[in-house]
């Protein structure tokens, strides 16, 4: 005798999935859900179905959403830099993907102690990056020499060799701190624009 197929589960009401992302404990909404920029974009898309913008705003939006970063790991901070790109923090969801070549990179993360011997190599790699280029100084050693500040062979901050846009403090800074520095860099790019820097 054939068995009857139970289809009672198909009549269950559909339940919407919970919003994904970092939830703000104060509001219970994902972080950035009340950002006026995104709200105005959503309203304009709902009204017209398309967006009107300037070329500069479009280029800035594209640039902040597709920053390619190059590692310049010199010491222990490089471990936290690698941790930021792993699945737990997943920097690529913010459009921040790693590249191996300076000619394909927009951002250089200097992580660790910069010595006098390594300074010319840092400058050479920085000069190979296309414009506009940005530098994140990660950790106390890259920011100002750190623990080895008084050593004869240490550069007291990578800003003496290349211009730095964002400083991430700590010894070593956590992956969350570096990710916050990346978000600050994206905010700085949006604020500064692309035509003039």
UniProtKB/Swiss-Prot annotation:
Q: Which Gene3D superfamilies match?
A: 3.40.50.12280
Question: Which membrane topology term applies here?
Answer: Peripheral membrane protein
- The top EC class, named as a word, is translocase
Write out the GO biological process terms. aerobic respiration; electron transport coupled proton transport
- Name the Gene Ontology molecular function terms of this record: 4 iron, 4 sulfur cluster binding; iron ion binding; NADH dehydrogenase (ubiquinone) activity; NADH:ubiquinone reductase (non-electrogenic) activity; quinone binding
| Keywords, ordered alphabetically | 4Fe-4S, Cell inner membrane, Cell membrane, Iron, Iron-sulfur, Membrane, Metal-binding, NAD, Quinone, Translocase, Transport, Ubiquinone
InterPro entries referenced in this protein's UniProt entry, alphabetically: NADH_UbQ_OxRdtase-like_20kDa (IPR006137), NADH_UQ_OxRdtase_20Kd_su (IPR006138)
Task: State its Enzyme Commission number(s).
Answer: 7.1.1.-
| Localization | Cell inner membrane
Q: Which residues bind [4Fe-4S] cluster?
A: 76-77, 141, 171
Q: What is its main location?
A: membrane
Q: Which residues form the signal peptide?
A: none
User: Where is it found, in Gene Ontology cellular component terms?
Assistant: plasma membrane; respiratory chain complex I
What reaction gets catalysed by this protein?
Answer: a quinone + NADH + 5 H(+)(in) = a quinol + NAD(+) + 4 H(+)(out)
Cofactor binding, per record: Binds 1 [4Fe-4S] cluster.
Which cofactor does the UniProt annotation name? Answer: [4Fe-4S] cluster
SUPFAM superfamilies in alphabetical order: HydA/Nqo6-like (SSF56770)
Q: Which family does it belong to?
A: Belongs to the complex I 20 kDa subunit family.
Which NCBIfam families does the UniProt entry name for this protein? nuoB_fam (TIGR01957), PRK06411.1 (NF005012)
Xref: PANTHER family:
NADH DEHYDROGENASE, NADH DEHYDROGENASE [UBIQUINONE] IRON-SULFUR PROTEIN 7, MITOCHONDRIAL
Q: What does this protein do?
A: NDH-1 shuttles electrons from NADH, via FMN and iron-sulfur (Fe-S) centers, to quinones in the respiratory chain. The immediate electron acceptor for the enzyme in this species is believed to be ubiquinone. Couples the redox reaction to proton translocation (for every two electrons transferred, four hydrogen ions are translocated across the cytoplasmic membrane), and thus conserves the redox energy in a proton gradient.
Q: How does it assemble?
A: NDH-1 is composed of 14 different subunits. Subunits NuoB, C, D, E, F, and G constitute the peripheral sector of the complex.
What name does UniProt use for this protein?
A: NADH-quinone oxidoreductase subunit B
């Amino acid at each position: 005798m054939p068995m009857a197929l139970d289809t009672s589960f198909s009549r269950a009401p559909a339940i919407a999935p919970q919003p994904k992302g970092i939830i703000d404990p104060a509001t219970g909404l994902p972080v950035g859900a009340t950002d006026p920029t995104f709200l105005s974009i959503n309203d304009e898309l709902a009204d017209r179905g398309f967006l009107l913008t300037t070329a500069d705003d479009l280029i800035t939006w594209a640039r902040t959403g597709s920053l390619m970063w190059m590692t310049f790991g010199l010491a222990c901070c490089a471990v936290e830099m690698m941790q930021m790109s792993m699945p737990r923090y997943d920097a690529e969801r913010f459009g921040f993907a790693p590249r191996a070549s300076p000619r394909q990179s927009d951002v250089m993360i200097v992580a660790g102690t910069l010595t006098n011997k390594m300074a010319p190599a840092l400058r050479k790699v920085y000069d190979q990056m296309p414009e506009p280029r940005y530098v994140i100084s990660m950790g106390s050693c890259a920011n100002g020499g750190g623990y080895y500040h008084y050593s004869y062979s240490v550069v007291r901050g990578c800003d003496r060799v290349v211009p730095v846009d964002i400083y991430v403090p700590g010894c070593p800074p956590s992956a969350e701190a570096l990710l916050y520095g990346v978000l600050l860099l994206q905010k700085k790019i949006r604020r500064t624009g692309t035509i003039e820097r």
